[in-house]
């Protein structure tokens, strides 16, 4: 049904200038959730963005605005009056307003802040003081706070009076007179409480999982995965409650981190823009530097081949198997690296696990290498008709290459973590470049020994 509504909306927009059926357009928009409406906005020309946005129901407009990409948000802001912009800013959650300010150019930021009310402006400025990738940078200050001496009835009344403007009321956070976090109580517990005169201190859970304002956002997202929370409280150095991180922010963090890791693992500069929103120049800048670096790194393989030209000249058939060996080594190393990076990303693997990693990877590598070597040996003798010594050289190299590649693939991400470098950088392209050179060294030295070159 949603797809039908979207298509109907797009058809009406195409003929809007002629039809002027604004009420019909509004009726269709009211049937669509904010993410679907935002997808329609992304495809509109800049001059139609304000027209459609003004038709959004008031309670939906802020949600649609939040779902838009920064580029589309800026185009829309440029088409809104100051009064309309103020209405949008007033409806945004503080963390979303802070994200907006961080993404916009200075002239747009100045206009946004000038339209925000003093309280919102103060909270935005407070959040901007925290590092962007920290819990403080992604938290919201709009939370439901209770006191331990409140009764259930008083707490429910406080939620009814103040809960409308909060990010979430599923969990209410209990603080003492100094705003120090002492417990958490769920709305579920309050609703089901049999005695409305019971104090909150008797219902609250005092074993609260919290993070500090400086906790890395990726670590925060892992807590959501581990405990299944909908929100996590954020405290300062003195355990005073300053905000919460909600599940929607955690999902955004995981998506951003995954996108960044995938880009780095494929030697592409990360970008927060959708593919079709990136210009040719953006794509060029994200790829060319890495390609240049990898091309220069690959010259080591050329130097190795040049150093063993005599061996290749003596047994030219060896040249035919270089691509197979380097590809096998690169693939094995990439498999190992991807597995280790994934384990580190979800907290399963720590740097001190390196000895266990090497032990496991070496055994797996020997099994994989032996399997490939046996199959390859038969293929070389039966189909390629090479001599047994040449087949032995290729297969011994294959086993050694698989072993070395998987060990390198296991070591580099852990080393990167110890050096405080993103492990994703030590991924497929870089591993392949390193393994190519080492594979050739192994190949030619095995050939010299076995073939007496």
Regions found by a protein language model. Name each.
Residues 415-435:
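Interfacial loop-to-transmembrane junctions
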């Amino acid at each position: 049904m949603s797809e039908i509504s979207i298509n109907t909306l797009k058809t009406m927009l195409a003929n809007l200038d002629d039809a002027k059926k604004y009420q019909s357009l509004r009726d269709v928009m009211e049937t669509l959730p904010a993410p679907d409406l935002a997808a329609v906005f992304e495809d509109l020309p800049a001059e139609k963005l304000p027209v459609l946005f003004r038709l959004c129901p008031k309670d939906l407009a802020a949600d649609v605005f939040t779902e838009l990409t920064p580029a589309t948000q800026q185009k829309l802001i440029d088409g809104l009056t100051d009064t309309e912009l103020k209405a949008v800013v007033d409806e945004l959650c503080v963390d979303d307003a802070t994200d907006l300010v961080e993404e916009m150019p200075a002239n747009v930021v100045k206009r946004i802040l000038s339209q925000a009310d003093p309280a919102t402006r103060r909270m935005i400025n407070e959040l901007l003081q925290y590092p962007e990738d920290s819990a403080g940078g992604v938290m919201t200050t709009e939370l439901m706070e209770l006191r331990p001496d409140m009764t259930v009835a008083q707490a429910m009344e406080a939620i009814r009076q103040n809960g409308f403007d909060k990010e979430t009321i599923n969990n209410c956070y209990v603080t003492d007179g100094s705003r120090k976090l002492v417990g958490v109580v769920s709305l579920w517990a309050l609703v089901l409480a049999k005695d409305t005169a019971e104090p909150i201190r008797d219902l609250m859970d005092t074993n609260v999982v919290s993070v500090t304002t400086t906790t890395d956002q990726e670590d925060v997202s892992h807590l959501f995965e581990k405990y299944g929370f909908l929100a996590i409280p954020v405290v300062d150095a003195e355990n005073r409650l300053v905000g919460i991180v909600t599940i929607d922010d955690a999902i955004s963090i995981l998506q951003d981190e995954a996108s960044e890791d995938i880009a780095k693992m494929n030697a592409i500069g990360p970008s927060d823009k959708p593919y079709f929103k990136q210009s040719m120049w953006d794509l060029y800048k994200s790829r060319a530097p890495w390609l240049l670096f990898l091309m220069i790194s690959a010259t080591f393989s050329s130097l190795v081949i040049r150093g063993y030209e005599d061996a290749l000249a003596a047994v030219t058939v060896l040249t035919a198997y270089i691509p197979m060996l380097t590809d096998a080594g690169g693939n094995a190393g990439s498999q190992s690296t991807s597995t280790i990076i994934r384990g580190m990303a979800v907290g399963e693997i720590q740097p001190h696990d390196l000895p266990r990693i090497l032990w496991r990877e070496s055994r797996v590598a020997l099994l994989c290498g032996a399997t490939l070597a046996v199959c390859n040996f038969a293929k070389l003798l039966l189909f390629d008709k090479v001599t047994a010594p040449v087949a032995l050289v290729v297969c011994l190299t294959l086993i050694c290459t698989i072993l070395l590649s998987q060990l390198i693939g296991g070591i580099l991400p852990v080393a990167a973590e110890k050096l405080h470098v993103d492990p994703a950088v030590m991924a497929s392209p870089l591993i392949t470049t390193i393994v190519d050179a080492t594979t050739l060294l192994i190949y030619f030295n095995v050939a010299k020994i076995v073939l007496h070159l």
